[in-house]
UniProtKB/Swiss-Prot annotation:
Keywords: Acetylation, Membrane, Methylation, Phosphoprotein, Protein phosphatase inhibitor. The modification Phosphothreonine is found at residue 72. Inhibitor of the PP1 regulatory subunit PPP1CA. It is a peripheral membrane protein. One of its GO terms (cellular component) is cytoplasm. This is Protein phosphatase 1 regulatory subunit 14C. Detected in heart, muscle, spinal cord, hippocampus, hypothalamus, thalamus, midbrain, brain stem, cerebellum, brain cortex and olfactory bulb. Induction: Up-regulated by morphine. Residues 1-19 have a biased composition (Gly residues). The modification Omega-N-methylarginine is found at residue 27. It comes from Mus musculus. Residues 50-62 have a biased composition (Low complexity). Residues 1-70 are annotated as: Disordered. The keyword Cell membrane does not apply.
């Protein structure tokens, strides 16, 4: 069973559910400046600057790596919270419909963004009926409730890069 929340990076995995945000630390280790050595005993103020073309290129490359490590993703937390509550409700309802725990549930994929992309309520209901075709219990009430819950929601937009 999976509830898909959006594009590739924000998709809920097999059992985790919910959008995931990954943070990457800058390359270069424990936070010391690249190229500095703690064993030399001299501080940066004491050492003379080296101004060669090769050194400048190396520093520029290290700065690029550092900037790549500092890029963070900013999501609308309120929208993510709504989405998470909805996903938890869906998992609970599917458990009742299929009469089993989440781990034992057949693979049912309900893509919320796909439903929000649909042109009409009828198209959304049709997609949900298709996803729940193997369910032996009546699904009309679940579909009606899910459609009413997503009515005010927006599709999760691709993550925006925060300015550094």
């Amino acid at each position: 069973m999976s509830v898909v929340t959006g594009g590739g990076e924000a998709a809920g995995g097999g059992g985790g559910g919910g959008a995931r945000v990954f943070f990457q630390s800058p390359r270069g280790g424990t936070g010391g400046s690249p190229g500095s050595s703690s064993s030399s005993g001299s501080s940066r103020e004491d050492s003379a600057p080296v101004t060669t073309v090769a050194a400048a290129g190396q520093v520029q490359q290290q700065q690029r790596r550092h900037q790549q490590g500092k890029v963070t993703v900013k999501y609308d937390r309120k929208e993510l919270r709504k989405r998470l509550v909805l996903e938890e409700w869906i998992v609970e309802q599917l458990g009742q419909l299929y009469g089993c725990e989440e781990e034992e549930m057949p693979d049912v994929e309900i893509d919320i963004d796909d439903l929000l992309d649909a042109n009409s309520e009828e198209e959304r209901a049709s997609k949900l009926q298709e996803a729940l075709v193997d369910c032996y219990k009546p699904t009309e009430e679940f579909i009606r409730e899910l459609l009413s819950r997503i009515r005010g929601m927006r599709k999760l937009s691709p993550p925006q890069k925060k300015s550094v």
